């Protein structure tokens, strides 16, 4: 649900040349407000007068052996359909858990709860990881809910999360604790 698109490279490439070609293609229809190669990713940010928010495209530079499947990308606003190699939802959930533990970004919690509500299970996690997740979620403050999460949500949904937090995600983490094993060195 985030207002960004995340991609991963699947084979080595000339990143500078790729960024030049991608920027050139996007500038035909969008204002490119940022385009650079960062330490971990190739980053582009776009805007258009047709949509009120900017779109961030992030292409991770590390090649990983993720669980993927071919999906059809489509939009109700266009007739073009494009096949993509996409992470499975289970892989996406694993990545979101890992990302939240790495960067403590509230949008990762929103994405985890969103997927849980649509039937994607949490990956198997040991008790120490579950405790870290729960503690970090509890540490999220009002500013994160109102500003960071609020900037990507509509008002009615924002009000629910501001008042209840990640109640459903916390419930699922609590359930997972009941069957989790302690990690032993």
Provide a role label for each language-model segment:
Residues 1-2:
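Short, charge-patterned binding micro-sites
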Residues 5, 10-185:
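Structured mid-to-C-terminal alpha-helical surface segments
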């Amino acid at each position: 649900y985030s207002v960004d698109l995340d991609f991963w490279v699947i084979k080595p490439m000339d990143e500078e040349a790729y960024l030049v070609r991608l920027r050139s293609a996007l500038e035909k229809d969008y204002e490119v407000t940022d385009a650079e190669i960062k330490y971990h990713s190739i980053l582009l940010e776009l805007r258009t007068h047709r949509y009120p928010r900017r779109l961030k495209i992030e292409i991770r530079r590390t090649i990983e052996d993720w669980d993927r499947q071919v999906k059809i990308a489509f939009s109700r606003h266009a007739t073009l359909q494009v096949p993509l190699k996409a992470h499975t939802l289970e892989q996406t959930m694993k990545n979101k858990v890992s990302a939240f533990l790495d960067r403590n970004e509230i949008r990762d919690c929103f994405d985890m709860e969103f997927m849980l509500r649509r039937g994607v299970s949490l990956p198997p996690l040991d008790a120490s990881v579950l405790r870290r997740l729960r503690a970090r979620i509890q540490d999220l403050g009002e500013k994160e809910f109102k500003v960071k999460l609020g900037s990507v949500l509509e008002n009615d949904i924002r009000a629910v999360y501001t008042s209840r937090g990640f109640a459903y995600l916390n419930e699922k983490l609590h359930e997972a604790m009941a069957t989790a094993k302690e990690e032993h060195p």
